[in-house]
């Protein structure tokens, strides 16, 4: 009997096929998205999904874990080597779960978090009031100046007033390098833990293309997808054995039950890919590509928050335009270019409308595109935004994008 999705559930299979077509024919430029390695997808689709393994390697609450123990141990050892950390927990189901576990490990209810404001480039889990991180704990926020950069002296003064228990550094939309050394000095000045959330830049960090948060951060969290190109999931890293014990208890039995062993296998496979020499070439290209894109947009008289980028993303500001981030997102989407609307420093519109868009280079770099291709894309983005209500132009560019994308197909089938 044929147990394939195609035979057993054609309705779902057909939608997966259409998504494959979209990924191949559109330009995926959402900064948090990437194209996962086929080898990782194979691991995620394996029979490991059948195995319950509550606990940690060689200390499980279930029998029959001799093989998954070894797989998790491989994932841990590879992550330690990648990030230069002494201790790693690879069980968090996501970056948000990783952050929640860290808070559970080091904070008591109503302790204080000082994190980057969501509207300035932070993340929901850094204390936003709509998140449990802003409901279980007292949350306070720092932001960026109008130039799009953190003022560390100002942050130091704010920390003296707030006296946080943990200072969170990390972002979902910040275009410059973080000064982890300075952040640690600020945390130490008020007796706070420094937690680094490097979910967005982890793939650059492990390649030496972005500052390493160690040895400055007490604890580091990350996702395993985004710039790492691994499976959707999270990880927690530290060099402190006492903190590691607290983190492990917070993950299990604190906020999670059984780990997802098929995903942990995917993490192990992904980390092996990240350890290859080719990974450094990819990460360097990610940065070169976003800079090539930025140069074109600046030449076309578009304003970029902070004037450019040190990482994998740029933020376009439309404060001086008569259209919004939502308008730009829609127009570019109609032309086959996928970005996302984003709040920016000095924001004057609601978070549902915004005055900016966020654009990233990781996914298209994974498809083999280089500076020349990003320059072409930059011109097309500017053409669309110059005449944002011209739907005929959007249709024309969509056809060009489809033709352009044929040379950069990354997957030949939808299921691995």
From Swiss-Prot:
> Mostly located where?
cytoplasm
Q: Which gene encodes it?
A: glyA
Q: Which PANTHER family match?
A: SERINE HYDROXYMETHYLTRANSFERASE
Task: Give the cofactors, semicolon-separated.
Answer: pyridoxal 5'-phosphate
**Pathway per the UniProt entry:** One-carbon metabolism; tetrahydrofolate interconversion; Amino-acid biosynthesis; glycine biosynthesis; glycine from L-serine: step 1/1
Taken from the record, one Pfam family name reads: SHMT
EC number, as in UniProt:
2.1.2.1
Q: Where in the cell is it found?
A: Cytoplasm
Q: Where is this site: Plays an important role in substrate specificity?
A: 225
Please report which protein family the annotation says this sequence is part of: Belongs to the SHMT family.
Tell me which UniProt keywords the record has, alphabetically: Amino-acid biosynthesis, Cytoplasm, One-carbon metabolism, Pyridoxal phosphate, Transferase
Protein's recorded name: Serine hydroxymethyltransferase
Assembly mode: Homodimer.
């Amino acid at each position: 009997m044929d147990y394939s999705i195609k035979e057993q559930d054609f309705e779902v299979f057909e939608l997966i096929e259409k998504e494959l077509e979209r990924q191949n024919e559109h330009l995926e430029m959402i900064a948090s998205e990437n194209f996962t390695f086929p080898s990782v997808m194979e691991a995620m689709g394996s029979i490991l999904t059948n195995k319950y393994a509550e606990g940690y390697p060689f200390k499980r609450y279930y029998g029959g874990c001799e093989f998954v123990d070894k797989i998790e141990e491989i994932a841990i050892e590879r992550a330690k080597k990648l990030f230069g950390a002494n201790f790693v927990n690879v069980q968090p189901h996501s970056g948000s779960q990783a952050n929640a576990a860290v808070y559970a490990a080091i904070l008591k209810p109503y302790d204080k978090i000082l994190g980057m404001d969501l509207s300035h480039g932070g993340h929901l889990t850094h204390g936003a009031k709509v998140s449990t991180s802003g409901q279980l704990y007292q949350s306070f926020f720092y932001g960026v100046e109008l130039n799009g950069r953190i003022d560390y002296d100002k942050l130091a003064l704010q920390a003296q007033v707030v006296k946080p228990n943990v200072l969170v550094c990390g972002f979902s939309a910040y275009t410059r390098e973080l000064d982890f050394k300075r952040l640690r000095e600020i945390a130490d000045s008020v007796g706070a833990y420094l937690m680094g959330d490097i979910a967005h830049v982890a793939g650059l960090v492990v390649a030496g293309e972005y500052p390493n948060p160690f040895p400055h951060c007490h604890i580091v969290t990350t996702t395993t997808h985004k710039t790492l190109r691994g499976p959707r999931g999270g990880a927690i890293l530290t060099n402190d054995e006492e903190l590691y014990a607290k983190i492990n208890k917070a993950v299990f039995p604190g906020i999670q039950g059984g780990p997802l062993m098929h995903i942990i296998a995917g993490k192990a496979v992904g980390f092996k890919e990240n350890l290859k020499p080719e990974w450094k070439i990819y990460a360097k290209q990610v940065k070169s590509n976003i800079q090539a894109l930025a140069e074109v947009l600046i030449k076309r008289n578009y304003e970029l928050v902070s004037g450019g980028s040190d990482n994998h993303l740029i933020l376009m500001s439309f404060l001086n335009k008569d259209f919004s981030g939502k308008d730009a997102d829609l127009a570019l989407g109609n032309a086959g270019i996928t970005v996302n609307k984003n709040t920016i420093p000095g924001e004057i519109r609601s978070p549902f409308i915004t005055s900016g868009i966020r654009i990233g280079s990781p996914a298209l770099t994974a498809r083999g595109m280089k500076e020349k291709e990003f320059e072409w894309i930059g011109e097309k983005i500017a053409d669309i935004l110059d005449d944002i209500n011209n739907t005929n132009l959007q249709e024309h560019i969509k056809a060009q994008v489809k033709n352009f994308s044929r040379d950069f197909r990354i997957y030949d089938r939808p299921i691995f």
